[in-house]
A protein has these predicted regions:
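Transmembrane alpha-helical interface segments in multi-pass membrane proteins
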Residues: 381-383, 390-435
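Short helix-loop junctions at transmembrane helix boundaries
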Residues: 418-466, 477-485
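A structural signal for hydrophobic secondary-structure junctions
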Residues: 70, 74-220, 236, 247-249, ...
Length: 495
């Protein structure tokens, strides 16, 4: 009814411009949502990769880079695994440290990981080399960022000295081999984090007790001298020997004519897990009763109680949007002496910045909808003005205003729908191509990512489409009401 030769000459270009305007606006909205959501997911994924969604730590542990020791509990470990939405649980320990090279020093956070560590994130950002094997006997290996390597002029397979800083007066040194270089683009993290086996953090932090047995290789006056020493803990050691009469660290005097085994259990006043050192004296000649005849000494330890301590548990969940719910569930499952740190608690400035990006998207959406409304209002008014004679004729024949208004609203809906359809084809099409082929590059030094990130948010796309249609049609009610002001007599007479 609204199509005629007149429309082809006058209205058609206006309608086409309105359709193109709506299509461009919708395409920009789709791209804005896809890019911002993609960027947020990329950055969130990298931050989570450095420290998981949650860290379960001691109540004495503030949000920082220096873990407070925590006695590992298999029960807590298994309970965390059973919680809904939890996909992975791993232990960790971190400590401030210093990497030294010939070119200078670099302060770092040394993160120790165990065999249960989820390597997916770190493997995805390793640019040179490869991680160490979990079953490798040699663990003196370290992964650093390319940023740190460039600053200190280090390269793959170089040996570096790392100092573990326990307090102002205690820095313990250990040499490592660089086995991999990673790069994320997040300078605050790349300039800090290095990764190694958790055993080094446990040992050099002095979290547990390491007991050693000392046995004299020379027999004097028919007796063999033995003693014990220990490291770690609080330094105030107490010794419990296999022989009740032996006290302290020694020396203990052993008179024996046959093979003998003995041990010492070492504890401290702070209640640190004890460690035990063992020794065995084996005589070569069993036929003799001379206590000073040739013998062999074998000593061993239980490995040190530091292996029983961790910095905490890291918990990964299947959906970042469930962070609050999962936090409540995790906290309720923990004993009184543990607490949780969400990833948003550990890096609030990054997540505040990411949240502000949503404001940019809202501004773009509002502007595009306003432009669409202006385009449609102009187009609808021109169509109505062109159709004054038709409107007057319909009114003269007895038609009321409502059916005529509906006709123009239906026509508006058709134009808006066509614009939204083309906007979806263009916007989602470009987003899908970028998601698949990554053909638009970025400078990672400025944007943290090497290509424009895309997240295809189908639910948001549908909401945007419905919202745009609803707002535009609602806005068309005002210009469509102009129909009610058209007089049948004047419009017919005018034409």
């Amino acid at each position: 009814m609204l199509r005629s030769d007149d429309e082809k000459h006058i209205s058609r270009p206006i309608v086409r411009i309105a359709t193109i305007g709506i299509a461009v606006g919708v395409a920009l909205m789709m791209l804005s949502v896809s890019i911002v959501k993609g960027f947020q997911k990329e950055v969130k994924g990298m931050v989570v990769g450095f420290g998981s969604h949650f860290q379960v730590v001691s109540n004495r542990d503030n949000i920082g880079r220096d873990s407070q020791r925590l006695l590992f509990s298999q029960e807590v470990y298994e309970d965390l695994k059973k919680l809904p939405d939890v996909t992975h649980v791993q232990v960790f320990a971190s400590k401030p440290g210093i990497i030294e090279s010939k070119q200078g020093l670099q302060g770092v956070v040394i993160k120790g990981v165990d065999a249960d560590y989820d390597w997916k994130f770190l493997e995805s950002v390793i640019k040179e080399g490869e991680r160490w094997s979990p079953d490798s006997a040699e663990t003196e290996k370290i992964i650093i960022s390319k940023l740190i390597a460039n600053r200190l002029q280090l390269k793959l397979n170089d040996k570096v000295s790392v100092y573990f800083v326990n307090n102002q007066d205690d820095a313990r040194q250990k040499n490592f081999t660089i086995v991999a270089l990673y790069e994320t683009g997040l300078e605050d993290y790349d300039s800090q984090y290095v990764f190694t086996d958790i055993s080094h953090v446990q040992k050099l932090s002095g979290w547990g007790i390491q007991a050693q047995m000392l046995v004299d290789t020379v027999c004097q006056n028919g007796m063999i001298t033995a003693g014990a020493m220990a490291f770690g803990g609080d330094g105030n050691f107490r010794y419990s020997w296999s022989s009740p009469s032996w006290q302290g660290e020694g020396p203990q005097f052993i008179y024996t004519t046959k093979d003998t085994s003995f041990y010492a259990v070492v504890r401290d006043l702070a209640g640190t897990e004890s460690d035990t050192a063992f020794a065995t004296i084996d005589f070569y000649d069993d036929s003799s009763v001379d206590p000073c005849r040739p013998y062999k000494i074998t000593t061993r330890t239980s490995g040190g109680s530091q292996q029983n301590y961790i910095g905490g548990y890291e918990v990964l969940i299947n959906d970042y949007d469930k962070l609050i719910e999962a936090d409540d569930a995790i906290f309720k499952s923990l004993p009184y002496d543990l607490q949780t740190h969400k990833v948003t608690d550990r890096s609030p400035e990054i997540f505040s910045w990411l949240a502000m990006l949503d404001i940019n998207v809202i501004i773009i959406i509002v502007l595009m909808i306003v432009i669409s409304i202006v385009n449609m209002t102009s187009a609808l008014l021109i169509i109505i003005l062109e159709r004054q004679q038709l409107i007057g004729t319909l009114k003269a024949l007895g038609s009321t205003d409502s059916p005529i208004v509906r006709i123009f609203l239906y026509n508006s809906a058709f134009i808006v729908g066509r614009g939204i359809l083309w906007g979806n084809v263009v916007g989602v099409g470009i987003a899908a191509l970028q998601w698949k082929f990554h053909f638009i590059p970025l400078n990672p030094e400025n944007y943290y990512v090497s290509t424009v990130p895309i997240s295809l948010e189908w639910g948001l796309f549908l909401i945007l489409d419905l919202f745009t249609i609803g707002i535009c049609l609602f806005a068309m009610l005002l210009p469509a009401k102009y129909v009610t002001r058209i007089s049948p007599i004047r419009s017919i007479k005018f034409n």
